[in-house]
């Protein structure tokens, strides 16, 4: 019998456009919300065995966050540390892992810097996003390196349909932003275009000065500005024989100011991709995707050039989904990418290649479901690495499901780790091995009509952590870490009310030193509550975290905090809406990174329009 992926029209349609068309949040009674990141195939959230959080365009317009990190903060398993608001350096921790141990995809393409190993989500305009899927737990058996804590996939392409959207926002810190978007269909051709811009005078993120590497303090009593402009365009065409092909591009560029030396960064974040896919037979779907991501930062000190780091990653992926007898969906494919680095820093190597083969079998046994995955990567820097994953789910009742899984993962050393030139105080180590991890977890999902409860308990053991070895003035694989955690979520929906609560509890330990891992709060909670009253909507968000340490030695502590936001929306007419929101209503002083102040009380007003 064919797998449900091929029998269900909406799943197959989404698969034909994977990963771009999957940006649409399909939410009807029959299928529920469709996700693709957990298995690289389209499935409903109800059918997904992995812990998944989906944030749609409707969520973004309801919350109106100023940035992607602000949208992600406090979601199940996520901890955000930032050097202030408005484009300042931000670290996203998923399940207690570091920012470099979380894989970020943009429209199916690997994003981020090959030198730092992280993705600058603070530079990605939230106005360009249609959907975010957060998959928690290792996914190296599907995606390869860096998916220790999980995968965050950001989709920028709108779903089906035609129309215009526009919005303008103004508020505190001299902040203005605007967005205009259109999408449509001409015959079998779809297109979309979104432009956005944001400008903020900002605030002084380090009122007491910025410490330098020379032990001094740089005091710059000025506001730290931010500018960002972005463009996203795409087109796709569907042939009568079922084959679909298309291309799209996203580019964001701007500048951010801060205190210190250097004190300004000009940036470019760019993702370009093209794809072709379709059903070769009734039981065989194939897709080829090629793309390039770019991460460029030009650092300036008082207006003079200081350093440049430009990463370009060309990638290709060929994926095949085969429906097998016995309710099985077999996915096999090839992935490959090449990292190139162009920098004012003289790295000993400026490129490396990675090739991989992967396979996954999804088996539906009625009450029981089983997913088995295996992948082998061959990287010219550190050789071959094999990862695997096994997940089992069982329906205890019609609305109650239990899951258990075990998976392995690894993080590739960065160009800074491997190839940084010897400058006396530091040099890269070309003999590094990847960091490796083993994760086990159990979960429970209870779906009771309007209420959905999710609980997951996990343990992640990480070996060969790459840390600075002062005795050798380089980095080495010398540390081990253990992360135990519990994450829970409760959602309620009705015609008039929407409520969501998330709580994450972490116990982290560097098993070499006995210290807690830095910038990981033991408890993180987020509560959202919205009331719909005809043409009006009222809402509030409470984000709370307890204290944490800022450094690996656990000598600098950060206090816990609670931040309360309020929002109200008035539907002026079917096409027009007015929204006001107040962030940090109680004007709390708090930091998520030592010496860097988070913004105080702030207010914003948004006027939006959409065609009916």
PLM features per residue range, with description:
Residues 330, 364-369, 457-461, 477-553, ...:
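Gram-negative outer-membrane beta-barrel transporters
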Residues 140-141, 153, 161-172, 176, ...:
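Periplasmic-side early beta-strands and strand-to-turn transitions of outer-membrane beta-barrels
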Residues 186, 218-339, 453:
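Outer-membrane beta-barrel domain signature, strongest for Gram-negative TonB-dependent receptors
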Residues 162, 188-191, 241-245, 280-288, ...:
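Repeated loop/turn-to-beta-strand initiation elements of outer-membrane beta-barrel proteins
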Residues 69, 73-109, 130:
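Extracytoplasmic beta-strand/coil segments of soluble accessory domains associated
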Residues 109-136:
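Short acidic/polar hinge/loop motifs at secondary-structure boundaries
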Residues 263-279, 309-314, 380-381, 395, ...:
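Outer-membrane beta-barrel signature, preferentially recognizing the C-terminal barrel domain
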């Amino acid at each position: 019998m064919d797998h449900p992926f091929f029998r269900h029209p909406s799943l197959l349609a989404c698969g034909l456009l994977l990963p771009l068309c999957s940006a649409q949040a399909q939410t009807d009674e029959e299928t529920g919300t469709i996700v693709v990141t957990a298995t690289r195939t389209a499935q409903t959230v109800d059918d997904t065995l992995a812990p998944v959080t989906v944030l749609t365009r409707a969520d973004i317009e309801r919350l109106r966050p100023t940035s992607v990190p602000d949208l992600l903060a406090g979601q199940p398993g996520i901890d955000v540390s930032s050097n202030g608001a408005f484009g300042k350096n931000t670290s996203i921790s998923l399940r207690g892992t570091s920012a470099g141990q979380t894989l970020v995809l943009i429209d199916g393409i690997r994003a981020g810097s090959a030198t730092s190993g992280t993705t600058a989500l603070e530079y990605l305009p939230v106005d360009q996003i249609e959907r975010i899927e957060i998959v928690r737990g290792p996914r190296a058996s599907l995606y390869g390196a860096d998916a220790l804590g999980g995968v965050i996939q950001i989709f920028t392409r709108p779903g089906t349909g035609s129309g215009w959207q526009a919005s303008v926002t103004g508020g505190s810190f001299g902040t203005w932003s605007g967005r205009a978007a259109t999408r449509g269909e001409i015959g079998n051709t779809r297109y979309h275009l979104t432009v956005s811009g944001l400008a903020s005078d900002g605030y002084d993120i380090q009122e007491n000065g910025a410490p330098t590497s020379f032990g001094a303090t740089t005091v710059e009593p000025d506001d730290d500005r931010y500018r960002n402009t972005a463009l996203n365009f795409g087109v796709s065409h569907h042939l009568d024989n079922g084959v679909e092909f298309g291309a799209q591009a996203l580019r964001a560029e701007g500048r951010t100011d801060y205190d210190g030396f250097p004190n300004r960064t000009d940036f470019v974040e760019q993702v370009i991709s093209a794809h072709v896919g379709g059903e070769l037979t009734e039981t065989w779907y194939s897709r080829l995707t090629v793309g390039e991501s770019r991460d460029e930062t030009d650092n300036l000190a008082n207006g003079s050039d200081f350093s440049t780091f430009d990463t370009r990653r060309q990638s290709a992926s060929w994926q095949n989904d085969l429906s097998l007898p016995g309710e099985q969906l077999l996915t096999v494919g090839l992935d490959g990418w090449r990292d190139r680095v162009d920098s004012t820093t003289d790295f000993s190597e400026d490129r490396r290649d990675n090739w991989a083969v992967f396979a996954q079998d999804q088996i539906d046994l009625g009450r029981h479901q089983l997913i088995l995955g295996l992948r082998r990567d061959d990287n010219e820097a550190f050789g071959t690495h094999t990862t695997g994953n096994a997940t089992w789910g069982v329906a205890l009742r019609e609305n109650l499901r239990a899951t258990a899984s075990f998976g392995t993962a690894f993080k590739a050393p960065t160009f800074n780790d491997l190839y940084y030139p010897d400058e006396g105080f530091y040099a890269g180590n070309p003999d590094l091995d990847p960091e490796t991890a083993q994760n086990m977890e159990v979960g429970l999902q209870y779906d009771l009509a309007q209420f959905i409860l999710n609980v997951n308990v996990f343990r992640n053991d990480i070996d060969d952590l790459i840390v600075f070895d002062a005795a050798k003035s380089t980095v080495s694989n010398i540390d081990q870490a253990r992360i135990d955690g519990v994450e829970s979520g409760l959602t309620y929906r009705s015609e008039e009310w929407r409520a969501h609560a998330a709580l994450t509890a972490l116990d982290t330990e560097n098993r070499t030193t006995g210290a807690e891992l830095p910038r990981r709060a033991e408890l993180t909670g987020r509560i959202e509550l919205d009331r719909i009253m005809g043409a009006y909507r009222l809402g509030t968000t409470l984000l709370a975290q307890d204290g944490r340490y800022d450094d690996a030695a656990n000598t600098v502590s950060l206090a816990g905090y609670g931040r309360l936001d309020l929002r109200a929306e008035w539907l002026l007419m079917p096409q027009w809406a007015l929204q006001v929101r107040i962030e940090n209503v109680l004007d709390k002083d708090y930091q998520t990174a030592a010496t860097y102040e988070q913004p105080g009380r702030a207010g914003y007003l948004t006027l939006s329009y959409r065609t009916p």
